[in-house]
A protein has these predicted regions:
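Charge-dense, E/K-rich amphipathic alpha-helical interfaces
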Residues: 1-54, 85-86
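Extended, amphipathic alpha-helical stalk segments that mediate dimerization
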Residues: 34-103
Length: 103
């Protein structure tokens, strides 16, 4: 299990750690071979608060949603379909974004 920070505009995750890094970790990546994996938003209130504070920055590089920027009254993020990432040139890169919804 690898914990990833946000994905930038090029689809590259800005950091990857073996443990959750408060204030940075947004996604959890599951991989068997270290080359390809599936990722989802980490399901904790702390990550939801951070990601919902600026979804354009924290979520848009790795997620799709019906209305990603509309977070009024939202307190949780649910991953409906995990995204896919590949390890390339020493970094994890988004192949397919995860689909999320807010609650």
């Amino acid at each position: 299990m690898i914990y990833l920070g946000r994905a930038n505009r090029q689809g590259l995750f800005v950091r990857a750690d073996r443990r959750i890094t408060p204030g940075s970790s947004i996604f959890r990546l599951d991989t068997r071979d270290g080359l390809v994996g599936t990722f989802r938003v980490i399901d904790t209130p702390e990550v939801a608060d951070l990601a919902l504070s600026n979804p354009a920055d924290y979520l848009s590089g790795g997620c799709t949603a019906l209305d990603l920027d509309n977070t009024d009254g939202v307190s949780a993020i649910v991953t409906e379909n995990a995204g896919t990432a590949i390890f390339e040139d020493g970094r994890w890169k988004v192949l397919r974004k995860s689909r999320i919804r807010y609650e």
